[in-house]
Amino acid sequence: MVHNAYDSFQLLKDCPARIDAVESYGSKLFAGCYDGSLRIYSPPESSASDPSELHQETYVLEKTVAGFSKKPIVAMEVLASRELLLSLSESIAFHGLPNLETVAVITKAKGANAYSWDDRRGFLCFSRQKRVCVFKHDGGGGFVEVRDYGVPDTVKSISWCGENICLGIKKEYVILNTANGTLSEVFPSGRVAPPLVISLPSGELILGKENIGVFVDQNGKLLQTERICWSEAPTSIVIQNPYAIALLPRRVEVRLLRSPYPLIQTIVLQNIRRLVKSNNAVIVGLDNSVYVLFPVSIGAQIVQLTASGNFEEALALCKVLPPDESSLRAAKESSIHTRFAHYLFENGSYEEAMEHFLASQVDITHVLSMYPSIILPKTTIIPQPDKMVDISGDEASLSRGSSGISDDMESSSPRYFLESEDNADLESKKMSHNTLMALIKYLLKRRPAVIEKATSEGTEEVISDAVGKTYGANDSSKSKKSSKGRGMIPLNSGAREMAAILDTALLQALLHTGQSGAAIELLKGVNYSDVKICEEILMKSKNYSALLELFKSNSMHHEALKLLNQLADESKTNQSQTDVTQIFSPELIIEYLKPLCRTDPMLVLEYSMLVLESCPTQTIDLFLSGNISADLVNSYLKQHAPNMQGRYLELMMAMNDTAVSGNLQNEMVQIYLSEVLDLYAAKSAQQKWDEKDHPPERKKLLSALESISGYSPQPLLKRLPRDALYEERAVILGKMNQHELALSIYVHKLHAPDLALAYCDRIYESVTYLPSGKPSSNIYLTVLQIYLNPKKSAKDFAKRIVALGSFESSDTTKMMDSVLSSKAKGGRSKKIVAIEGAEDMRVGLSSSTDSGRSDVDTEEPLEEGDSTVMISEVLDLLSQRWERINGAQALKLLPRETKLHNLLPFLAPLLRNSSEAHRNFSVIKSLRQSENLQVKEELYKHRKGVAQVTSESMCSLCNKKIGTSVFAVYPNGKTLVHFVCFRDSQGMKAVSKTTHGRRR
C-alpha cells in the first residue's frame, strides 16, 4: 500500500543560525532565524530552471537581512496575490516583495501567538492573550481594524471558515461569529495534544483531537463518520491534494485524503520545526537545514500503485490528473479497472470484479471470454485473456466446441463423474453459479445503453431505406442473417451485433442459473438474441415456454405454432412429462393467435383449424373478437371446416346481427335449410316424415327465417320440396310480402287458424307492412276472404305459386286438388268442392308482392253454392280482432245467410267503441267551440282598451317624448314606448337568448 508520493531533497544545510520559520517566494527560499535575521537562499546562477518554483538542487545563500526582526521570527507567509510577506514575531509586520521593505506593522498584534489570513477577502485575524482581532487590508499599504472579540481562554490555533473564525482554545473548539461575536461550541479538544485547526481547500475544516482528525463544515457540524487517524498527534498539517501531510514528533506522514485515509508514505527526519506548503512542494524546516518534499508525478504514482496491486489508490489518483489530460486519465482508469477486475475475479470477488469491468467500459466480449461455457454467435471474435477461469460446472452443459460431442464422450468425461471428487464438483457448481450471477448483473447494467444504440441504429437504417439514400433495393453488399424479426442483424451492424452477443450470453446465463422466468421476460421485450444458438439451447433443456417467446419475439410464428401443436398433441397422448401436460393445451394456440388477427389473418385461419374441433367455442370467439373479415372466415370455414360454418355464423349473429352482411345471412339460412332437407330426405326414405313434427333443426330454420331479414327468399323457395315444409314456405312467402299465399298455406295446408291469426297479428304490428294508400287492417280482411271463399283462394294460390317459380305449371293441378281435398281442423272440416277448370289456369301476375287486396277492394261477388264457407273460423276471427278490422268492409264480405246473433261478439264491442268515439268527438268539438268564443271575447276586451297620449308622455325605454311617433302599449295599459324602441328591444332580447343558447 505504501509508495513514494514525495521525493525528499535537502535544499540547504549547515545554516549558522537556528531556523525558526521558512517560506518560499518563487524559486527563492526565506529562512527566518532565531537571531531575528532573514536569510534568502536561491538556486545556483547556472540553473536555468523555472524561476517560479523551488528547484531540486542545493541552494546557496543569496542575501542576509540582519535585524529583520528584533525577536525570533515565529512564522512567515508569502501573500502572492498582494506581493506581501507576512511575518509574526513580536508583532505582525508586512513587507513588500521582492525588496522586503516594511509596508505595515500592526502594533495591536504585539504578543500575538497565532494568526490566519483570508486571501480572498484580504482579512487578517490573530489572537493575543484572550482577545481575537480582525483587520482588513485597504488595498494599498495599510490595514484597518474591523473588530475586537473576547474569548474564554488563550487561543492555541486559529483559522478562517467562511466569514466566521474557528478557534482552538485550551479545552475545546469554538466557532466565532464575526457578525455578532457569539461563540458556538463544537466539541472538546484533546487532553494531551494542543488544539489544531486546519482549513481545507473546499472550505471545510480538520480539527485535531489527539491523533485523530475530525471533519466539520464551516458551522462546526460533523460531516462524516470517518476519521483520519495519524500514528501520533500531529503538530502541523499541510494539505496538498490529494494528500494530507502531517508533522509528527519524529517523522512526516503522508496520507491519502480519501476514506479510509490510508498511509501512503513516511519520511523520517530529526528535529523538524516547521512544515510549510509551497506552490509546488512541501518545505520541511529543521534546526539548521531545510528539506523539500517534491511530489512524484501522478502518472508515476499510478504506475507504482498498479504494479504493486494497490488498484483502489491508483484509481483515486486518476481523479486528480489535470483536466487537460482527460484522455490519458480515461485510458489509465480503464486499464486499472480492467486489471483490478481480473485480480478480483481470480480471487473469487466476482460481483466486485464485474463492477470494475463495467467501469472500465471494456468490450463485452472481453468479459465473456472468461466464460467458455457461454456460446456466442460465430461472427464474434473472442479475445484470449491472459488467464481464464473455467466456470462451466455441471449447469454449463454447452460450450463453444461441445455442439458436436456425443453423449458417450460426455459420459466418459472424468471431470463430472468421478466419485472421489464429489466435494470438488460441489465447489465447482457453487463457483459456477456465483460467477454466472455476477455476469448476469454485469450484462443487465450494460444492456440498456447497448440496446438503445442498436435500436437507434435500426431506426436510422429504416429511415435511410425509406428515402433511398443508404440501402438500395438491389444492394448486393448488404448481407444479412437468414433469420426473422429482431434476430435479423446485418453483419456490418456493430451496435446490433454487440446487442446480439449480450442478449445471447445473458439468456444462457439466466438459464444456467435456473432463472427461466427471467429468461422469458427477457425474450418478451426488445431483444437481439441469436435465434439459432438460443433455439438449440432451449430445445436441449426442454424450456418450451422460453422457446415460444424466442420464436414470438423474432416473428417466427409458424415455428411457434407448430411447436405448440406438437406439445398439445403430446399432452393428449401423455407422451411428455407431467409439467408439460399441465402447461401446454390447445387453448395456448388460441392465445398465441389473438395478437396476430390484425397483422396476419391467413396465418390465424390456417392454424386455428388445428384446434377448431377441440375448442370450437374459443376458436370462433377468436374469429369474432379478432376483427377478421367475416367473409374471409366464412369462406375459409366453408372450404376447410364446413361443419363449423353454421356455428360461426350463429355466434356472429348473436353478437351483433346488424353487422352481419346479407351474404352471410343467406349463407346461414342456406346451411339451416340444408340440414332440414337432409333430415327430410332421411325420414322420407323411412316414411317417418311428419309435417307437424318440429325437430331442433327445423325449429332453428323457422326461427332464422322469421328473425333474419337480410337473406334472399327466392332461392330458398326454389329449394323447398313440393309436398313438405309448408310452414317454412309460408314464412318465406311472408318475407316476399306474398301474405295471401302465406295465409292460404296456414289455412288450407296446415289447417292452423291459430298460426294464421298469429301471422296476421305479426304483420299488423310490424311497421314494414304499410301498403301505399291502404290500411294495415287489410291483412285480416285477406284471411277473411280465404275463410269465406276457399275455392277462389285455392285458385289464386295455385296461379301465384306458379308465377313465383316455386313449382312447374304441370304440378298445379295436383296441388289444387291437394288444397281442396284437405280437411279442416277440430271437427269443422267440410268437403270443399273440387276446383273445375284448373287446366285453364293462366300464369301471370303483374306484381311479385301481395298488396293485401280483398274482394271488397275489387267489388267481386262471392262465389256461392260450390264451396263451403269456414264460418266458424270467420266468427272467431271477428270476435277476437274486432278492434283491428274495418267493420263495414267485413260485413260486406259475410254471406247473406249469416245469423245476426252469431255476430254479436263482433258487433257489440264494435258499436260500443264507435258510439264512445262519436261522443268523445262531440265533446271535443264543443270544447273547441267554447275555447274559440273565449279567445274572441278576450280579443274584444283588449281592443276596447284606451291609451292616453299627451304632450308630456315619455317613452319608457329611451325616456324621450312620444309626440306624434308611432307608439306601442304594454299589456298593463300604462307603459308607453316608441314602436321603434320596442322593436329594437325585442331584437336585442332575441340576440341575447341565441348567444346564451350557443354558450350553453
Curated annotation (Swiss-Prot):
Its main location: cytoplasm. Keywords: Autophagy, Cytoplasm, Membrane, Protein transport, Transport, Vacuole. It comes from the Eukaryota. One of its GO terms (biological process) is autophagy. It is a peripheral membrane protein. It is found in: Cytoplasm; Vacuole membrane. Disulfide bonds: none annotated. Residues 16-282 form the CNH domain. SUPFAM superfamilies: WD40 repeat-like (SSF50978). CHCR repeats lie at residues 607-796. Disruption phenotype: Defective embryo arrested at cotyledon stage. Heterozygous mutants produce some yellowish seeds with developmentally retarded or abnormally shaped embryos. Conditional dexamethasone (DEX)-inducible mutants exhibit altered vacuolar morphology showing fragmented round vacuoles. Homooligomer. Component of the homotypic fusion and vacuole protein sorting (HOPS) complex composed of the class C Vps core proteins VPS11, VCL1, VPS18 and VPS33, which in HOPS further associates with VPS39 and VPS41. Interacts directly with VPS11. Binds to RABG3B. Belongs to the VAM6/VPS39 family. This is Vacuolar sorting protein 39. The gene is VPS39.
